[in-house]
From Swiss-Prot:
It is an enzyme of class 4 (lyase). It is a peripheral membrane protein. Residues 460-584 are annotated as: Unknown insert. Pathway: Cofactor biosynthesis; ubiquinone biosynthesis. Its main location: membrane. Keywords: Cell membrane, Decarboxylase, Lyase, Membrane, Ubiquinone biosynthesis. Catalyzes the decarboxylation of 3-octaprenyl-4-hydroxy benzoate to 2-octaprenylphenol. It is found in: Cell membrane. Pfam families: UbiD, UbiD_C, UbiD_N. GO terms for cellular component: cytosol; plasma membrane. Belongs to the UbiD family. This is 3-octaprenyl-4-hydroxybenzoate carboxy-lyase.
Length: 614
């Protein structure tokens, strides 16, 4: 189904019960986040807050709060159909000429889709029905959300930032958060490798000291929004890809104050410039990791014009501990990634980015193994093939019969097929997300690959598997009692898959180095143990959503992994997934996001009136 603009999409979602209008007055500061978070975690509808307290502009949240709504926004009936989108992207990334007449006929549908790629220029665009400029520019009139109690300022989140490098033929669309500073200034937070940052860098080289034009569009049609977060080939513009998704050309219009082309149907557009010499401290903000990030300097975006539709809608979201809307988007886009990877690596059966791993910090791959060392090639491929995976800290590679999305199967394969030291690959000093406070320094850290496949004979030649006697169920209870006696800080011990091969422990951490003490105690009791994961008391050791979140947010693999090797014995691996204390890390550690009890109580008191699930 085609959606010509955001309002068309909202209307369809409302018709199928996937959008709820909230007429009750709600404060954009904290209250909308609490309501949106509860709704998303329950798999609920998109929300349109019609009466934000203190503002005349409605606020739309949770638009892509379920994978199904992402699929609908891409014009697909269900999530599985997103693999067809991935196949199209894989084809466009590396097109193959027809092998003959019949093959050409088979490819006709693709060629017809490509015809929808050119954009269509609109002179009198809806997004410019109202224009604020000069002293009329006032972001205080826009209901920009404040999400968490310790956020430094309101945060603009869903804007499509449009830039163009001086040497590029096409524009770049990216989504970068923007801290509101004043009526006409925000901080543009983009990572160094992202398109907008690269465009600015090129501009500063060719136009030193000159202002860099930027436009930011809020509330575009769903295909354009999703085109900005999808891994489109470098040769394809996001607008062109949106045309492919929609089945019709993307309508654009020139900004009033610069030459950048913006979505013609956008609800609100900010136009202005970045002064290459103007910076400001950004943050802290509660982000998608579940923590507040560090304060960093970023460029300031000065807004010279605000254009909008009549009676505009402000599209917003929040980020927090998974699941949040970015995590849900990650689940849906995961299906797009699979065919792209399979075209390059046909041996890949499935590819999974667990949302609890912040949607990109861990990848589980299943493959049809074809030669010794094959798993390591796949690890390297994941890290190097797509920019989206350059920050993936952990890559787990399993055989094809393992369900990559079932932790009981993945962990069983780890226990059965791995010698931890032999089958682990560690790479240090690699690019890491600057928001990852667990890395030793900003932007640089380590990555770990785990080869969970069955080993071939040649792979065992230098390091054969060692058989260990299993602790009986009768003995396990006594061993656990001894461990807890030695380590009173232990809160709970979980034996994954009902044996001691893999043990997950939660502790009330008392000092730096506590995790190693726990590992040593477990290894002293369980000869067969291969893996110990030590977590803090806020982790449910029976819940792999909790465990993976702790592992991916609180570990630098090289620093926080301990190997124990003895001649004639299977090696052992200990993962310290606790929050690090002074002396255990160099950087300021992240502070977990905590909800404001007063806000929670306020929403509790009006929850039934909202009728979100009625």
């Amino acid at each position: 189904m085609q959606y010509k603009d955001l309002r068309d999409f909202i209307g369809h979602l409302e018709d199928i019960g996937q959008l709820k209008r909230i007429s009750h007055p709600i404060d954009p500061h904290y209250e909308m986040t609490e309501i949106s978070d509860r709704t998303l975690r329950a798999g609920g509808p998109a929300l349109l807050f019609e009466n934000p307290i203190g503002y005349d502009i409605p606020v739309l949240t949770n638009l892509f709060g379920t994978p199904e709504r992402v699929a609908i926004g891409m014009g697909r009936k269900d999530v599985l159909e997103l693999r067809e989108v991935g196949k199209l992207l894989a084809y466009l990334k590396e097109p193959e000429p027809p092998k003959g007449f019949k093959d050409a006929l088979d490819k006709l549908p693709v060629f017809k889709q490509v015809l929808n790629m050119p954009t269509k220029n609109i002179r009198k665009a809806a997004c410019q029905q109202i224009v604020w400029q000069g002293d009329d520019v006032d972001l205080d009139k826009v209901p920009v959300m404040s999400c968490w109690a310790d956020d430094v300022a309101p945060l603009l989140t869903w804007g499509l930032t449009i830039t163009k490098g001086p040497h590029k033929k096409r524009q770049n669309l990216g989504i970068y958060r923007q801290q509101k500073l004043s009526k006409n200034k925000v901080i543009m937070r983009w990572l160094a490798h992202r398109g907008g940052a690269l465009d600015l860098r090129d501009w500063m080289e060719t136009h030193p000291g000159e202002p860099f034009p930027v436009s930011v569009a809020f509330g575009a049609d769903p295909a354009t929004i999703l085109g900005a977060v999808t891994p489109v080939p470098d040769t394809l513009s996001e607008y062109a890809f949106a045309g492919l998704l929609r089945g019709s050309r993307t309508e654009i219009t020139k900004s009033i104050s610069n030459d950048l082309e913006v979505p013609a149907s956008a609800e609100i557009v900010l136009e202005g410039y970045i002064d290459p010499t103007e910076f400001a401290d950004e943050g802290p903000y509660g982000d998608h990791t579940g923590y507040y990030n560090e304060v960093e300097k970023h460029h300031v975006f000065t807004v010279t014009h605000i254009t909008m539709r009549k009676e505009p809608i402000y599209h917003s979201t929040y980020t927090g501990r998974p699941p949040d809307e970015p995590a849900v988007l990650g689940v849906a886009l995961n299906e797009v990634f699979v065919p792209i990877l399979q075209k390059q690596f046909p041996e890949i059966i499935d590819f999974y980015l667990p949302p609890e791993g912040c949607s990109y910090r861990m990848a589980v791959v299943t493959m049809k193994k074809q030669y010794p060392g094959h798993a390591k090639r796949v690890m390297m491929g994941v890290w190097s093939f797509l920019r989206q995976f350059m920050y993936t800290k952990f890559v787990l590679v399993c055989d094809e019969e393992v369900n990559a999305r079932d932790w009981s199967q993945v962990t069983a394969a780890m226990s059965q097929h791995m010698d931890p030291a032999r089958d682990s690959l560690m790479i240090e000093n690699t690019p890491i997300d600057s928001l990852d406070f667990a890395s030793p320094v900003v932007g640089l850290g380590s990555k770990m690959g785990l080869d969970i496949t069955k080993k071939w004979e040649v792979e065992l030649a230098l390091s054969p598997n060692v058989e260990c006697s299993l602790t009986s169920s009768e003995q396990i209870e006594g061993c656990i009692a001894e461990i807890t006696k030695m380590c009173p800080e232990i809160i709970e011990i979980h034996l994954q898959n009902d044996n001691a091969n893999m043990v997950v422990v939660s502790i009330n951490k008392q000092a730096a180095g506590n995790a190693k003490k726990i590992m040593d105690a477990i290894w002293a009791q369980f000869e067969e143990n291969k893996f110990v994961i030590v977590c803090d008391d806020d982790v449910n050791v029976s819940d792999w959503n909790d465990i993976i979140w702790a592992v991916t947010t609180r570990m630098d693999p090289a620093r926080d992994t301990l190997f124990l090797q003895s001649v004639g014995e299977t090696s052992k691996m200990g993962l310290d997934a606790t929050n690090k204390w002074e002396g255990e890390c160099l950087r300021e550690w992240g502070t977990p996001i905590k909800k404001d009890p007063e806000v929670v109580a306020k929403i509790d008191s009006i929850w039934d009136e909202l009728g979100i699930f009625k």
